[in-house]
Curated annotation (Swiss-Prot):
Name of the protein in question: Uncharacterized protein R287
Segments passing through the bilayer: 4-24, 34-54, 74-94, 106-126, 162-182, 189-209, 217-237
Membrane topology: Multi-pass membrane protein
GO CC terms, sorted: membrane
Localisation per UniProt entry: Membrane
Residues bearing glycans: 73, 185
Organism: Acanthamoeba polyphaga mimivirus (APMV)
Lineage: Viruses, Varidnaviria, Bamfordvirae, Nucleocytoviricota, Megaviricetes
Keywords, alphabetical: Glycoprotein, Membrane, Transmembrane, Transmembrane helix
Coiled coil: none
Length: 242
C-alpha cells in the first residue's frame, strides 16, 4: 500500500511469509493473527492491482470532477476495505474475550451499521449533483482515486452528504475502542502493532492527511513482525518453564 505496484507486491510477499509462520507455528490465537494478516494481505494485493489496472489519476487538490468507471469501482472497493477494518478488530475481540462478549457484540453491530450506512451514503452520492469540496481531504468532486503529493494512493469519496459521512477520526476511534478492550497481551500485540505502524508511517513516510488511509505498507513489517517476535518470545518462555 505504498508508492507503486512493485512495493505493494513486495509487502504482499512479506504477509504470505508471516501468515505461513502463524499456520506452521500455531500459537495461541493463531487464527486471529492469520485473520489479521490475511486481511491486510488482501489490501496489499488490491492496491497492487489498483496501481496496475485502476487507471489512477495524477495528483489533484480537489480530486477528479469526472472519473472513469474502472477507477470508480476500485475506489468503492477501497472504501469497503477501509470500513471492514473496525469490524475485523471487534470480531477478533469477540472471539478472544472471556468477559466482554456483550461489549464486543454491541461494538460489532455498531461497526456494521457505520459500514453499511457509509456505503449507502456513498452510493447516494452518485445521484447527487456537484456540491462544495474541501481541498486535500477525503471528500472529492467524485468518488475517484488519484496519486497523492508523496506518491501514495489518494482515495476520495463523494457521499450523499458530508455531515454524517464516516471520516478518518471515526475510523481511528472505532479501531482503538477494540484495542483498549482486548484482554491479554497475546491479542493486545495486534493493536499495538497497528498503532505503532500508524505512528511510524506518519513520521517516517510523511504522507499527507488525505494519503494516510492507503499508507499502510509498513504494517506488514511493524505489526506482523511484532506479532512474530511476541509469539517467538512467549513460546520460548513457556518452554523454559516446562
Amino acid at each position: 500500500m505504498c508508492w507503486n505496484y512493485q512495493v505493494s507486491l513486495i509487502f504482499s510477499v512479506i504477509y504470505v511469509v508471516t501468515n505461513s509462520y502463524y499456520v506452521v507455528k500455531r500459537p495461541l490465537y493463531w487464527k486471529q493473527y492469520l485473520l489479521f494478516g490475511s486481511f491486510y494481505l488482501t489490501m496489499e494485493v488490491f492496491q497492487t492491482l489498483q496501481w496496475l489496472f485502476g487507471n489512477v489519476y495524477s495528483d489533484s487538490m480537489y480530486g477528479q470532477s469526472v472519473c472513469n468507471s474502472i477507477n470508480v469501482n476500485y475506489t468503492i472497493v477501497a472504501f469497503i476495505l477501509i470500513w471492514l477494518q473496525p469490524i475485523l478488530f471487534s470480531v477478533i475481540g469477540y472471539q478472544t474475550t472471556t468477559t466482554n462478549k456483550w461489549f464486543f457484540r454491541v461494538l460489532t453491530v455498531l461497526n456494521c451499521f457505520v459500514f453499511f450506512y457509509g456505503l449507502k451514503l456513498l452510493y447516494g452520492g452518485f445521484e447527487k449533483p456537484d456540491y462544495y469540496t474541501i481541498s486535500d481531504s477525503m471528500f472529492g468532486s467524485s468518488t475517484c482515486t488519484n496519486e497523492g503529493e508523496t506518491g501514495h494512493l489518494v482515495w476520495r469519496f463523494k457521499p450523499k452528504t458530508l455531515d454524517v459521512f464516516p471520516n478518518h477520526l471515526t475510523y481511528i476511534i472505532l479501531c482503538i475502542i477494540s484495542f483498549v478492550m482486548y484482554e491479554n497481551n497475546a491479542t493486545r500485540v495486534i493493536g499495538l502493532g497497528w498503532l505503532l505502524s500508524l505512528i511510524v508511517t506518519k513520521l517516517l513516510l510523511a504522507p499527507t492527511l488525505v494519503e494516510i488511509a492507503s499508507s499502510w505498507c509498513l504494517l506488514s513489517i511493524i505489526a506482523n513482525l511484532l506479532i512474530v517476535a511476541y509469539v517467538h518470545i512467549s513460546t520460548g518462555i513457556y518452554l523454559t518453564g516446562q
